């Protein structure tokens, strides 16, 4: 566990952050002077304009939590659900060394989609499409409620705070478009396989696996983060098993979350 990760799990750290307005001050500084980094193998670039992006960059590029689940030679297409600022696309560009990566980056936080667009453009990933909206909603309408937090991590269709951590501010309810991922995939990527599907949608994973079975039929590898205060790993594992996937490995498990790798049989 990295230092950043340890701090993120200390309630005293979060109370100090709120009391001293560290997030606001650090966010202001990073937006004025973003931290831009290039990955050594390919020069793929990413930037940190938010405190939370430092945590994500540590998870993806330093702790390499997704690395074992990705076979670079077998990845040309992907979908990232709950893409946040878009770092997963940067990782795939670096690992595969492909400029013709084709995929979808979906998030229901409009500010995160703006940052994702920067990462796509900066790395010349012309076949990767950012999509604003919500997947995994049981709502029957064209839009659904979504709840934002001042922190760019944890926004969800469920206004439920993560146990064991102090609240990172008040929830703000917005309406966002519902995304039919199969239709959006066909429109932007074509009738092709999805080699890697990453799911990190803050508790909506169970509903997504229930409502998007047609899209899942075209998926080969699933990397899924589950959120224990909303859904158990056993629940999502059973759902994926029913759709032809097997659990290969739990890549990481913490007190309230975990990341698992599933492969089509």
Task: List each model region and its residues.
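Phosphate/nucleotide-binding beta-alpha loop and adjacent structural elements of enzyme active sites
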Residues: 1-265
